[in-house]
Curated annotation (Swiss-Prot):
UniProt-listed Enzyme Commission number(s): 3.6.5.n1
Keyword Nucleus among UniProt keywords: no
Record's keyword terms, sorted: Cell inner membrane, Cell membrane, GTP-binding, Hydrolase, Membrane, Nucleotide-binding, Protein biosynthesis
Matches recorded under NCBIfam families: lepA, small_GTP
Domain annotation tr-type G: ranges: 2-184
UniProt protein name: Elongation factor 4
GO biological process: positive regulation of translation
Subcellular location: Cell inner membrane
Gene: lepA
A family per Pfam: LepA_C
Membrane topology: Peripheral membrane protein
Length: 597
């Protein structure tokens, strides 16, 4: 057991986590050169395309150190994006140490900082590593000072390496062996195994990734899931060397996968504890804190026949992604679907894309909203995650919107732009600290503004140098109103948005103009209106298509023309009474792009 090292890699997006993990696998011979693909651990097509890590993956490698001993390295790759922070905290719970990878050209970024603090709170040994030293822009000395200054860990003798060229990778491995402590635990105690992750395999049922804290797990053991109390027999277990390899047992301190023939998706929730059915452990391991979704949106299948498949797909996906929340919802405009909760806009896009790719579904998404706390006049407090659920205006005493605490790291040159952006997003400054050339800004900004397009705007005003980390802070009283969209006088529930009263006029006008571009012209006028309560704040009209009925009159009497025009007008009027408006999917997405261009 003293030869086991469990660690994960934490870093900001694009600082080279996945490339470094490729090198570690290659050096330790986990895969032959033929099987090496770029970013081995990003196994989802989506991850490769976008170049981001979404799911945490685990690998077991054997490394023969310079002292002649062979060490078993269990290494868990983690995502770097703010929307996937929960994946990181899960991975860290299974480790004793973490490699903090920092790009020697870019320096410390907000995300690195947030994940690093998570690791330090969990009492992990954090080992700084300066990556990308092969780049001409690399300044390892400056960055090492920056790490000490901002993060506060000792970085003078940080390993300098380049994952791309392979320089310094051996030093990284030596450092892992020397700096990261061996796992604690009692091999003879009753089994305690923490479920780090699970996913659904069509042949095997639920596959769980576990970290054995105490005791050991063997093939054919009878095990019990602590939260549900159900017992199962272990069919297969093993490790990943990125490939799934079967073994006969998993011992204390090891990380591996287990298949127990669980067919029910909720049978082995992430963060749960496994123990033996006979003389098992008394109490469960402390799991992970449940993450609360920050952004909600309605997802509806385009054809209602897909509803059942959609429900199954969401079930399988939520097993694999513990932070996805969903409940059934019906909409007058879109039929049956689900209200889903996500951690942020990127998470929402990824989930939608995974549903469409992996499960062949066509989906319509409604505009994302955050959760509002509403105090009603009868002093009851309700939480509203969709504009349709907002109580009537005269029942509302006050609406409180969620405020996010944003930590922004930005080079001093771009400070002005970023502050202007924060003020435009109704932010209030909390703190501002200079670290050398970097400035650490802390702002309280309404969550609704942050999740919509704050991240994109922040990147563009600072030419990509600013980085952001945010978390929910509190609810605060605010003047929010619901803007409804009416088509020919009928409300379309799926198009309503909740926005701040100061922005409601402009948002309403932009929305109406945007919708006008997307609704195809029909045989009669379509009036698109935005309203707050009964008060119309903006309107635009999609003009009708009309036939030129006067084409056959040459010269002639004006009363003849009047008669033909009047006849056409009456026909159009009749049409309008029975006609209904077809809304294309783009019209629903128009809401997302309001105010972007």
């Amino acid at each position: 057991m003293k030869h086991i090292r469990n660690f994960s890699i934490i870093a900001h997006i694009d600082h080279g986590k996945s490339t470094l993990s490729d090198r570690l696998i290659q050096v330790c011979g986990g895969l032959s050169d033929r099987e090496m693909a770029e970013q081995v651990l990003d196994s989802m097509d989506l991850e490769r395309e976008r170049g981001i890590t979404i799911k945490a993956q685990s690998v077991t490698l054997d490394y023969t150190a310079k002292d002649g001993q062979t060490y078993q390295l269990n290494f868990i790759d983690t995502p770097g994006h703010v929307d996937f922070a929960y994946e990181v905290s899960r991975s860290l719970a299974a480790c004793e140490g973490a490699l903090l990878v920092v790009d020697a050209g870019q320096g410390v970024e907000a995300q690195t900082l947030a994940n690093c603090y998570t690791a330090i709170e969990m009492d992990l040994e954090v080992v700084p590593i300066l990556n990308k030293i092969d780049l001409p822009a690399a300044e390892p000395e400056r960055v090492a000072e920056e790490i000490e200054d901002i993060v506060g860990i000792d970085a003078i003798d940080a390993v300098r390496c380049s994952a791309k060229t392979g320089v310094g990778v051996d030093e990284v491995l030596e450092k892992i062996v020397s700096a990261i402590p061996a796992p604690q635990g009692d091999p003879d105690a009753p089994l305690q195994a923490l479920i780090i992750d699970s996913w659904f395999d069509n042949y095997l049922g639920v596959v769980s990734l576990v970290r054995i804290k105490n005791g050991s797990l063997k093939k054919n053991d009878k095990i019990k899931v602590m939260s549900t109390g159900q017992t199962w027999g272990v069919d297969r277990l093993g490790i990943f060397t990125p490939k799934q390899v079967d073994t006969d047992s998993l011992d204390t301190g090891e990380v591996g996968w287990v298949v127990c023939g669980i067919k029910d998706i909720m049978g082995a929730p992430v963060g749960d504890t496994l123990t033996l059915a006979k003389n098992g452990c008394e109490k469960a391991l402390p799991g992970f804190k449940k993450v609360k979704p920050q952004v909600y949106a309605g997802l509806f299948p385009v054809s209602s026949d897909d509803y059942d498949n959609f429900r199954d797909a969401l079930g399988k996906l939520s097993l694999n992604d513990a932070s996805l929340f969903y409940e059934p919802e019906t909409s007058a405009a879109l039929g049956f679907g689900f209200r889903c909760g996500f951690l942020g806009m990127l998470h929402m896009e990824i989930i939608q894309e995974r549903l469409e790719r992996e499960y062949d579904l066509d989906l319509i998404t409604t505009a994302p909203t955050v959760v509002y706390e509403v105090l009603k006049t009868n002093k009851e407090i309700v939480y509203v995650d969709s504009p349709a659920k907002l109580p009537a205006i005269n029942d509302i005493e006050e609406i409180r919107e969620p405020i996010a605490r944003c930590n922004i790291l930005v080079p001093a040159d771009y400070l002005g732009n970023v502050i202007t952006l924060c003020i435009e997003k109704r932010g209030t400054q909390v703190d501002m600290v200079y670290h050398g050339n970097q400035v650490a800004l802390t702002y309280d900004i309404p969550m609704a503004e942050v999740v919509l397009d704050f991240f994109d705007r922040l990147k563009s005003t600072s030419r990509g140098y600013a980085s952001l980390d945010y978390g929910f802070q509190r609810f605060e009283m605010s003047h929010m109103v619901r803007v409804d969209v009416l088509l020919n006088g009928d409300k379309v529930d799926a198009l309503a948005i909740i926005t701040h009263r100061d922005n409601s006029q402009t948002r309403g006008r932009q929305l109406v103009e945007k919708m006008k571009e997307f609704i195809p012209r029909q045989m009669f006028d379509i009036a698109i209106q935005a309203a707050i309560g009964n008060h119309i704040i903006a309107r635009s009209t999609v003009k009708q298509l009309r036939k030129n009925v006067l084409a056959k009159c040459y010269g002639g009497d004006v009363s003849r023309k009047k008669k033909l025009l009047k006849k056409q007008k009456e026909g159009k009027k009749r049409m309008k009474q029975i006609g209904n408006v077809e809304l294309p999917q783009e019209a629903f997405l128009a809401i997302l792009h309001v105010g972007k261009d």
